[in-house]
A protein has these predicted regions:
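Juxtamembrane transmembrane-helix termini in multi-pass membrane transport proteins
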Residues: 3-76, 133-153
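Short alpha-helical transmembrane interface motifs in multi-pass membrane proteins
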Residues: 11-16, 84-87, 116-119, 156-157
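Selected transmembrane alpha-helices and immediately adjacent juxtamembrane segments
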Residues: 2, 111, 115-134
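Selective transmembrane alpha-helices of multi-pass membrane proteins
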Residues: 70-101, 157-168, 179-212
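Hydrophobic alpha-helical transmembrane segments of multi-pass membrane transport proteins
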Residues: 143, 149-172
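Hydrophobic alpha-helical transmembrane segments in multi-pass integral membrane proteins
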Residues: 59-61, 122-132, 195-209
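Membrane helix-loop-helix hairpins that form the core translocation module of multi-pass transporters
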Residues: 40-115, 171-179
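Membrane-embedded alpha-helical segments of transport systems
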Residues: 48-59, 123-125, 156-165
Length: 212
């Protein structure tokens, strides 16, 4: 019976993890752009994401979720910084015509994909709130199966992120030979617009939280 419950729980974690990676967000947009000149960009972004996510996961497991839930001003400040960063990132991408020029983008735009994974995760208030709410439920349930299963659940969760990032990057690499000039421009503008929308949302919602 315990084995069935564990299998069902792992299935639940897989579904939750897949729903997260399939939802378009700043990390996805950044991965798409970076993948044009680096087929391992998705993996690197995922590593950066994990550098922030694993310590937060441990904090939630240690009982710190309530701290995040009860400190809206802190989350709001993170949202303001994150929103400003996304606006900067989005405007840079919107204006950078060399984004899909492999030689120029390698030295100019791409920098460190790991760092982008870290910053876009660290300054994403929605990510922190997810772990303080939905993530708390996952962690609490995982603890009923023991510490080993708890750590295994995080590994499974991250492997979903990693698999999605690698798949996205390799897909972009395979498809880029078919990109027409106009299609490259459309992809750049769509990704930039997505990042800008999230930037505005993080910024305005965080300011509203502080003002309320």
């Amino acid at each position: 019976m315990a084995e069935i419950e564990l299998a069902a729980f792992i299935g639940f974690v897989l579904i939750i993890s897949l729903s997260g990676v399939l939802f378009p967000g700043p990390l996805t947009a950044a991965t798409v752009v970076r993948s044009y000149s680096d087929k391992w960009a998705g993996a690197k972004v995922s590593v950066g994401h994990a550098i922030v996510e694993f310590p937060l996961f441990l904090l939630v497991a240690a009982g710190s979720a309530t701290f995040f839930q009860q400190n809206e001003p802190l989350i709001a400040v993170i949202g303001i910084v994150g929103g400003a960063y996304l606006l900067f990132f989005g405007v840079k991408l919107w204006r950078d015509k060399d984004t899909f020029d492999e030689e120029k983008s390698k030295s100019k735009f791409t920098g460190s994909a790991v760092v982008i994974g870290i910053t876009l995760t660290l300054f994403n208030p929605a990510f922190i709130l997810w772990w303080a709410t939905i993530g708390l439920v996952v962690v609490t349930d995982a603890l009923t199966f023991g510490t080993t299963i708890l750590l295994a659940i995080w590994v499974i969760h991250w492997l979903v992120d990693l698999g999605w990032g690698i798949g996205l990057s390799f897909g972009i690499q395979k498809a880029k030979q078919y990109y027409a000039s106009q299609m490259k421009k459309v992809i750049r503008f769509v990704c930039a617009a997505l990042i800008l929308i999230f930037g505005v949302y993080f910024l305005t919602s965080s300011i509203w939280t502080i003002a309320a």
